[in-house]
């Protein structure tokens, strides 16, 4: 699977992505702190890190829905039109409502290492 890496030098090239799902690690989470993984409607996978690679402000420009999620350690409340899945260890998956059926039969704790592959396979 090809991953397009976004950094502070190239993030402006990706400001208009049609993001259908993204995951991030909340404060104190296990895994990649600040990691932001995004899948677009054309099945492309993007990655950045708002703790080390880009600023929080740049991350919000890339993925505006991220700013509207109300998060704490164990839950997040996404904006209308999106669904949240807690994947354990402080990791969250946020999916557009039109794509949630793909994950409806899966245990959210099983999504952590698999959601990107599952989603991309279904939309390609």
Regions found by a protein language model. Give the residues of each.
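Repeated scaffold domains used in trafficking and secretory/extracellular systems
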Residues: 19-26, 73, 80-88
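N-terminal non-globular leader segments, chiefly Sec-dependent signal peptides
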Residues: 4-6, 17, 21-24, 31-32
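Generic alpha-helical hydrophobic packing signal
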Residues: 16, 40-41, 82, 100-101
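Short beta-strand motif characteristic of blades in beta-propeller domains
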Residues: 31-44, 89-98, 117
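Residue-level detector of intrinsically disordered, flexible termini
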Residues: 20-24, 28, 37, 58
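Short glycine/serine- and acidic-residue-enriched loop/turn motifs that recur at repeat junctions
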Residues: 1-13, 34, 49-77, 103-124
């Amino acid at each position: 699977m090809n991953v397009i890496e976004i950094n502070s030098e190239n993030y402006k090239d990706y400001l208009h992505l049609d993001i259908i799902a993204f995951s991030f690690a909340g404060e104190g989470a296990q895994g990649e702190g600040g990691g932001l993984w995004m899948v677009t409607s054309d099945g492309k996978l993007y990655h950045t890190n708002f703790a080390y690679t880009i600023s929080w402000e740049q991350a919000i420009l890339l993925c505006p829905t991220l700013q509207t999620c109300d998060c704490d350690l164990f839950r997040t409340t996404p904006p209308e039109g999106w669904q949240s899945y807690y994947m354990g260890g402080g990791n969250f998956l946020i999916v557009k409502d039109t794509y949630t059926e793909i994950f409806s039969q899966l245990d959210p704790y099983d999504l952590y290492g698999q959601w990107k592959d599952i989603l991309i396979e279904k939309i390609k």
